């Protein structure tokens, strides 16, 4: 099947300045992400960035770059600019791969594209089971609950679903119903155009989760269990050191 990968790579980061260009074992992080995307079989891979240094690093590795504005409020808005500049048709399948995921398995990039292509839905994503209480109660681990057909009912930083009987006895174990959302999305290009035409929703501001805008406006998001679990993403200097060790 045919799909396009877009990798947003914003240069500024409060916790890790210049994050796309941090060195991981001799290569900029964004180049590692580009290489994982190439392994997915995508027809085209575009790095969307607001910084010339990132563009130069990607082009030196043989990658394609689309320069974008620096004032986007979300990654989806940056994708929308790329969709318009490249003139993608509404039915083009786009996979958004985060630029700080150098250990993302290529198999799940393709998985989310295939899941979207097989359904009449504008957006698809992935999740993995949560097995530890620490992760279940961590607000940085976004949880998702699904309906009987595998569509998202809600995403939250809170612990959902709340296992009333289990948690009344102990907060140290979790059952088998808790899922952690992975920050990888598949969209049809036309859906991205619609998304950015909607006003932000109150829920996305409360939770700071932009995918809640989709549910707020009554649209569906398909969620499948990922075929592989991604390695550590890079948000902080500690994450960076951990990834360097894991990729050595």
UniProtKB/Swiss-Prot annotation:
Give the main location.
cytoplasm
GO cellular component assignments:
cytosol
Q: Which UniProt keywords apply?
A: Cytoplasm, Lipopolysaccharide biosynthesis, Nucleotidyltransferase, Transferase
Q: For this chain's UniProt record, which GO biological process terms are given?
A: CMP-keto-3-deoxy-D-manno-octulosonic acid biosynthetic process; lipopolysaccharide biosynthetic process
For this protein, the Enzyme Commission number is: 2.7.7.38
Q: Which domain of life is it from?
A: Bacteria
Q: Entry's Pfam families?
A: CTP_transf_3
InterPro entries to which the protein is assigned, alphabetical: Cytidylyl_trans, KdsB, Nucleotide-diphossugar_trans
Show the NCBIfam families listed in the entry.
kdsB, PRK05450.1-3, PRK05450.1-5, PRK13368.1
HAMAP family assigned to the protein according to its UniProt record, in alphabetical order: KdsB (MF_00057)
* Name the record gives this protein: 3-deoxy-manno-octulosonate cytidylyltransferase
